[in-house]
Amino acid sequence: SKVKDTIIYLVRHAETVDENGIRNTNEDSQMINEKEILSVEGEEQAKKLSKNNELKNLDIIWSSSYTRAKATAKYIAYENNLIFNLDNNLSERKLGNLKELGKFMKDKSTRDPSQEQLLDRNYKTSDGESAEDTRKRMNIFLNRILKEYEENKIAVVSHRGSDKILFIKLV
């Protein structure tokens, strides 16, 4: 009999809201990043995405634990009558100390830290993550689900930065 394929749909979370208002909170930049919510358009985007035929009849759904990823995954889960599972290995790359990152970026032409970290894959701030760190944990996740969910149809909701790092190694 024919062996069924394992299919993984890698989904980037929907659009987020710009939070440029006054912030009288004691949240650090990492906490702010993790709690970022979808915009009204992002909610609509996620709802529309969840109705995509490719994402029908899924066997399992995995998501980053960041709020924006879970907010995207909930629609896909609802349409498939499934719960979604969380894995920290799917988190966005941790930028870490923003002052250090600013120093690293000051003479760079791209103004895009994730782009620069792809060129210097081991660079990281004192409490941040390098592209290589991110690639390793994304691979841990991918290898595990390929083993545990063979012949399944899987949706994985993650982030542009970490997805980009994963794809560079896959290609």
PLM feature spans:
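Cofactor-binding loop segments of dinucleotide-utilizing enzymes, especially the Rossmann-like FAD-
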Residues: H13, N89, H159
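Phosphate-handling substructures
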Residues: V17-D18, Q30-I37, Y78-I140
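Acidic, low-complexity terminal tails and accessory targeting/binding regions
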Residues: S1-I7, N52, L82-L86, E92-D107, ...
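Short beta-strand scaffold positions
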Residues: S63-S64, K136, V157-S158
